[in-house]
């Protein structure tokens, strides 16, 4: 076979692997987030009650904002 055919085959296989990897990782993350959803305000309120703190709406919003800001940094 000609060299250009081998190069074309390698490029096509590389693109197919990249697309398959992308969709596989995407499906994995969708399933992971479905099984382990991010924490919401109700869960945060329950956690604060278990720690013996009285959760005010202001404190809940502060903690949610801090967690979202911390998640963006990573």
Curated annotation (Swiss-Prot):
Entry-linked Pfam families: UPF0154
Entry's transmembrane regions: 4-24
Keywords: Cell membrane, Membrane, Transmembrane, Transmembrane helix
Entry-linked InterPro entries: UPF0154 (IPR005359)
Subcellular location: Cell membrane
Keyword Transmembrane: yes
One GO cellular component term noted in the UniProt record for this chain: plasma membrane
Membrane topology: Single-pass membrane protein
Similarity remark: Belongs to the UPF0154 family.
Protein name: UPF0154 protein LVIS_1358
Organism whose genome encodes this protein: Levilactobacillus brevis (strain ATCC 367 / BCRC 12310 / CIP 105137 / JCM 1170 / LMG 11437 / NCIMB 947 / NCTC 947)
């Amino acid at each position: 076979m000609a060299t250009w055919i081998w190069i074309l085959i390698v490029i096509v296989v590389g693109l197919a692997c990249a697309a398959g990897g992308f969709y596989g990782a995407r499906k994995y993350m969708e399933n992971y987030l479905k099984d382990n959803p991010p924490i919401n305000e109700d869960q945060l309120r329950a956690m604060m009650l278990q720690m013996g703190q009285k959760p005010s709406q202001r404190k809940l919003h502060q903690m949610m904002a801090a967690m979202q800001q911390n998640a963006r940094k990573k």
